[in-house]
Amino acid sequence: MGIALMIVIVVVAYIVFMTGPTIPDHAKIAIDSIVDAEVPEFVKGDTGYVVSDDYHIWYESITPVDSVKGTVLLFMGISNDALGWPQDFLDNLVRSGYRTIRFDYRGTGLSDWRNGHEDRPWSLRDLAHDAVIILDSLTIEKAHLLGISLGGMVAQEYAINYPERALTLTSVMSSGYITDPDLPPVNKAFVVDLVKNSVRYSIIHSEKNILRRNVAVRMLLRGDALYDIDVEGVSMQVLYNIRNRKGYNPGVSRQQQKATFLSGSRYEELEEITVPALIIHGMNDPFIPIEHSMKLAEIIPGAEAMWVDNMGHDVPPYLIDSLTRTLVKHFSSR
């Protein structure tokens, strides 16, 4: 029985290895050289920890050199930590005069990782509460909320539960109810590709394969949009996480999925929010159908919408400058 099971596992692993997503040769060559290079510093602001519900939560606050127009609070997507934000995007926000705060969710980055999540599950509202505690520690009264994917859902929870602490809401490629039976569901074939990718590059554990896995994920997230992935930038950021932080928590994706399902629909509450809202979604998103953001734009009072051509479930490098200009205009409404 043991030998038979082992044979099955080997066969399945071989099939996944042969059929799973791969990356082009030029990306492999770039990754091979990056592994041997010196990793630059990715954390340039003031850092610290807060304690929220017995979790130690890591944050970074980057303040402009000149006058501060306001504060932007960033909420990252599923399985990612604070370092998932493109450096060029952070630099643009700070140059535009906005103090920019990013933080590691529970179970990611330098924040506490916990087992036994099933016994004491947390919700998206708890993640939003962690962000409020960070603002309290920095004596910041209000912030502009910007969330991507899962982060868009957390930002929505913040706007719903702490409206007096929110200036604006920007929800990017997200949903107000991810299991809405009246909307197209999350792309299951895409999820299968993610699983295949994880298996393909986890059979042999090495820094190179971790980098390859993350670059391949970015290529999958691009969908059928036509733009180049920043292989060097993604690889350097991942390598920094491996060598200078705690790496990646393999269990956090499941915990975050459970938090999403526990949180359920936010439609009723979103119909009542009063903060200016901007809804953004890529028209080539292979993961969350754009109809989810269309529903958000429909139910949030006065919400503005931007449907972006040639954008998947990621922020393309070539769009960072124009996206920053759009956001700064939105922020100026408050």
Regions picked out by a protein language model, each given a short descriptive name:
Residues 55-113:
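Conserved HGGG/HGGXW glycine-rich cap/lid loop of the alpha/beta-hydrolase fold
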Residues 11-49:
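An N-terminal hydrophobic leader/cap segment in hydrolases
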Residues 141-183:
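Conserved hydrolase catalytic core segment
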Residues 303-334:
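Catalytic active-site module of serine/aspartate enzymes centered on a nucleophile-bearing elbow/loop
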Residues 194-198, 204-268:
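Alpha/beta-hydrolase
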Residues 125-143:
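Conserved acidic catalytic loop of the alpha/beta-hydrolase fold
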Residues 169-203:
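Flexible "cap/lid" loop of the alpha/beta hydrolase fold
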Residues 273, 279-281:
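Short beta-strand/loop motif that positions the catalytic acidic residue
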